[in-house]
Amino acid sequence: MTVVEAKNISKFYGNKYLGKTIPALDNVSLSINKGNIFALLGPNGAGKTTLFKILLGILPVTTGKAFILGLPPENPLSRKKAGYLPENPEFPSHLTAAKLLRFAGRLYGLDKSIITERSNELLRLLGMEKWAGTKIVNFSKGMVQRIGIAQALISDPEILFLDEPTDGIDAIGKAEVKKILKSLKSKGTTIIINSHLLSEVETIADTVCILSRGKVIKISSVDELTTQECQYEIETESEKSSIEIPPEMGKVRFLAANKLLITLNHDEDINNVIDFLRKNEVKIKTIKPLKVSLEDSFIETIKRSGPQQQFDKDI
């Protein structure tokens, strides 16, 4: 079931009548299914934050259409079941953590009893219970992020928009946030993340959308992006001094006495290689595609997309 959709969205800044415009988004289309953790990746200025703001109705589109749960962003009801953590959130400094959550709950129109129950639950979940009565002005960057995630969750949203959710949070806190996000996914919550921490995205995201210069370069699963095409690591049950495969299939390199790296000329030849090895009495213990990091795959994808505009921050 599709819960978030963008259809040919373009957003231009500047004065089109003077011919001076900057394309923040250029004909962007995507769809996000229920229960998916969907990550937006791209260099600074790629348009990730702009897309967030358009989907949430904060910015108008120049052309195109967007829908959240079937409703356009200009309809306030489209945000009724959405939670949002902006990048570098700034909350009223005079509020305490507990008062911020109460305020957020009231904005969603929640009953007082539900606000109290959810606030207490989220303060515990985000490790902020003992700071419930502390004013936000006294919070560290990581504490602001934690309470920011809590306020995004106050309405128990169906869709969660998180812009750099673990920015400023320590390693233990990052692990806790990842655990929370995985738990939310298991309950059917759709999570959309904008993050520069690709190693983090790799461990939690289902689908990745790579943006560059306002355009969608690739939408793919994390598994597809991190699988090295035409390369497989094979572990054999016994040590071999030499193994060859027909050159029209590919070549073999020993990683260890019982580990081979097979580089194929064509990925579809893997079954033929397995049959060939078995016929030559090579007993295969395991076989797995060679993996690359999401970061390496991302950098290579961006390089192939062409020269980048340089921005100091996201747009």
Segments (PLM) and residue ranges:
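ABC transporter nucleotide-binding domains
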Residues: 2-6, 11-212, 218
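ABC transporter nucleotide-binding domain
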Residues: 178-264
